[in-house]
């Protein structure tokens, strides 16, 4: 199997590339150890990555939440436009590759409880960009251009090295910094709760999501209730 991984030099991407070592993996990023170096924000580069030989695209490259909020134009280019360029490359390649997308729970609002019925309501540009990409992936899948699936990630921790610009970066820092002998002033209240996941489980989830057949995952479809049921559900029956 020939696999393309964008964001291959990142925290999640590099771990995913290692886990896929049994396959032929083409990793791309702006820095080593990615095999193909380039900026996915440039349309020509993004569209050159998908060839008819690619079986699966893992699209992990993104500008994280804080960065996308600070620089709307760059966030739109990296998170939204580059994703559409990759989708177009898949469409033009003409062989319906799998397209596994790293989405985010940032598509939701700040509610405490989230389940499968929770409606998306992003509060940041990053979440809005991820949600738009999900809709595009649904449509490209519906039309038979790709076999798309998306994973809405919570905070992945503990991220090594220096902090990135993610809004939730403090969650790794409160563990990482003391372990390296550095003080850290936590910017949130002591009773703050957030969804977290380990790197190993994220990598496993991506691989399992890729292996699932499309008919098991199923399309994202709204349920339309007959108009006659609306008054009944609101007012009851006699």
Language model segments and positions:
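Rossmann-fold cofactor-recognition segment
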Residues: 30-43
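NAD(P)H-binding glycine-rich loop region in Rossmannoid oxidoreductase-like domains
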Residues: 40-78
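Glycine-rich NAD(P)-binding loop of the Rossmann-fold in SDR/ketoreductase-type enzymes
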Residues: 70, 74-85, 120, 124, ...
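Conserved Rossmann-fold NAD(P)-dependent oxidoreductase catalytic core, especially the SDR/UDP-sugar
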Residues: 84-124
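NAD(P)-dependent short-chain dehydrogenase/reductase
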Residues: 138-193, 199-207
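Mid/C-terminal beta-alpha module of Rossmann-like enzyme folds, strongest
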Residues: 208-238
């Amino acid at each position: 199997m020939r696999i393309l991984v964008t964001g291959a030099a990142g925290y999640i991407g590099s771990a995913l590339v290692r886990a896929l070592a049994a396959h032929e993996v083409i990793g791309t990023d702006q820095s080593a150890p990615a095999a193909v170096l380039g900026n996915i924000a440039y349309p020509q580069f993004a569209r050159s990555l998908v060839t008819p030989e690619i079986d699966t695209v893992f699209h992990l490259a993104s500008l994280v939440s804080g960065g996308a909020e600070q620089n709307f134009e760059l966030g739109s280019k990296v998170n939204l436009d580059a994703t559409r360029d990759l989708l177009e490359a898949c469409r033009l390649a003409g062989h319906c590759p799998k397209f596994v997308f790293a989405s985010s729970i940032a598509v939701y609002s700040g509610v405490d409880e989230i389940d499968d019925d929770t409606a998306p309501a992003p509060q940041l540009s990053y979440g809005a960009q991820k949600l738009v990409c999900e809709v595009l992936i649904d449509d490209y899948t519906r039309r038979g251009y790709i076999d798309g699936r998306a994973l809405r990630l919570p905070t992945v921790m503990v991220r090594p090295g220096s902090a990135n610009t993610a809004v939730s970066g403090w969650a790794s820092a409160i563990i990482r910094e003391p372990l390296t002998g550095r003080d850290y002033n936590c910017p949130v209240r002591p009773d703050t709760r957030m969804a977290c996941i380990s790197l190993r489980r994220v990598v496993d989830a991506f691989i399992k999501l890729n292996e699932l057949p499309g008919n098991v995952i199923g399309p994202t479809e709204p349920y339309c209730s007959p108009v006659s049921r609306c008054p009944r559900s609101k007012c009851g029956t006699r």
